[in-house]
């Protein structure tokens, strides 16, 4: 991100979301989000991917909350560094804990869907962990733990 001006990055991001991400947003994924919305659940995406890339994805799903790795900015330009704690592995748990504390909420009746073995620290803390479109290693671990394994095509 640091090598290009903001206008170029935003243009590329728009094209990326339109051509690569939008086709991956399946009716099944949208229906799952809508089920949680209808239940009155707090909707949150938590991802290791940076917020510059993931904010439009959260917006496309109508998910109002996003915890993502934050790219450092200086005078409107990305520096190539990370600001704060990256939301990766245990950092994801740390960032979520801070977010929950700030909102006076907790993980009671929480649901978390992941396709990554890197999310085991968070999967093991929520009430309802789900492995989604998981690779063989995560799927095997999820089955061993008794967690549901979903394929959302």
What are these language model-derived features?
Residues 6-153:
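C-terminal cap/substrate-recognition subdomain and adjoining C-terminal extension
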Residues 1:
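Helix-loop "lid/cap" segments that line or gate small-molecule binding pockets
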């Amino acid at each position: 991100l640091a090598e290009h001006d903001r206008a170029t990055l935003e243009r590329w991001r728009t094209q990326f979301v339109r051509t690569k991400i939008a086709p991956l947003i399946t009716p099944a994924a949208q229906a799952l989000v809508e089920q949680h919305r209808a239940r009155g659940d707090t909707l949150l995406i938590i991802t290791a991917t940076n917020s510059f890339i993931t904010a439009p994805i959260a917006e496309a799903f109508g998910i109002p909350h996003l915890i993502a790795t934050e790219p450092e900015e200086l005078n409107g330009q990305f520096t190539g560094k990370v600001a704060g704690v990256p939301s990766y592995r245990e950092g994801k748990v740390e960032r979520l804990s801070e977010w929950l504390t700030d909102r006076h909420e907790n993980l009671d009746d929480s649901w978390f869907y992941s396709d990554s073995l890197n999310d085991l620290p968070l999967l093991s803390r929520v009430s309802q962990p789900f492995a989604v479109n998981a690779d063989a290693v995560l799927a095997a671990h999820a089955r061993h733990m008794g967690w549901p394994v979903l394929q959302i095509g």
